[in-house]
Amino acid sequence: MSSEGLMVFTGNANPKLAEAVVKHLNIPLGKALVGRFSDGEVQVEIQENVRGKHVFILQSTCAPTNDNLMELMVMVDALKRASARRITAAIPYFGYARQDRRPRSARVAISAKVVANMLEVAGVERVLTMDLHADQIQGFFDIPVDNIYASPILLEDLRKKNYDNLLVVSPDVGGVVRARALAKQLGVDLAIIDKRRPKANVAEVMNIIGEVEGRNCVIMDDMIDTGGTLCKAAQVLKERGAKQVFSYCTHPVLSGGAAARIADSALDEVVVTDTIPLRDDAAQCGKIRQLSTAPLLAETFTRIVRGDSIMSLFAE
């Protein structure tokens, strides 16, 4: 894989993913000190020449969200001042994406827009992310945004499993487009869970649209946070006669007691990617399995540098 003129740096959010990406690119990981001063302020020093290079900073803004976001901002500034030719922020998991609008004109921030502004002011010239929580966030930027998808990775794994009588389930109405695309590619039926959310991180399953009895159900979503909604959905699917229930999700946020909740749930398996490193309790959970996004990210980095099409990676 040609990677001439390309350099990859990382903060402390997901160094293992960065190491896997540069291994696929057959280049070393960029040398940088990303630490803290005694008072907790972020300290960054680029420790090699980046002049005239196309630099990618691979940094998910996952928990600790504010620390990882600030590391990214300070790294961008350090690279800009070191005369990098172009800076791409590769943010596999884009934090602060869940507040992307003002529902019913509520007095809330649009934090996704705030982060977009911060990245641009810092000096980012392109953003690369994966499975954005809301596609419209791309419009918050005045620079190019490439939102790629983990679907080829998840699809490949699903096809290897070769489940019979498969049914793709959307966890809510908002996820129907994603779930329908997966169902179409697999050539299977689609069901939808109709739910309402009275407050953040709390959802009540209302109804299931579609026949699930005797089916192997795959719940497709962009992220798992507390896992409460997912576990409740699996329980209802099993009560309606589902044979097995699997979940395929891109981002394993898995906050609070999510791993324990999944372990005790009706879910047979939860498959996630490595956009976010697994916490210790999640890594030890026998029901959670992680797939690598490194080959996809490495190929995307190369295509960006060459000026090749990225959309063709996902055309099917």
From Swiss-Prot:
Co-factor requirement: Mg(2+)
Function according to Swiss-Prot or TrEMBL: Involved in the biosynthesis of the central metabolite phospho-alpha-D-ribosyl-1-pyrophosphate (PRPP) via the transfer of pyrophosphoryl group from ATP to 1-hydroxyl of ribose-5-phosphate (Rib-5-P).
Originating species: Ralstonia nicotianae (strain ATCC BAA-1114 / GMI1000)
UniProt protein name: Ribose-phosphate pyrophosphokinase
KW tRNA processing (keyword) present: no
Binding site for Mg(2+) 1: 133
UniProt enzyme class: transferase
Keywords, sorted A to Z: ATP-binding, Cytoplasm, Kinase, Magnesium, Metal-binding, Nucleotide biosynthesis, Nucleotide-binding, Transferase
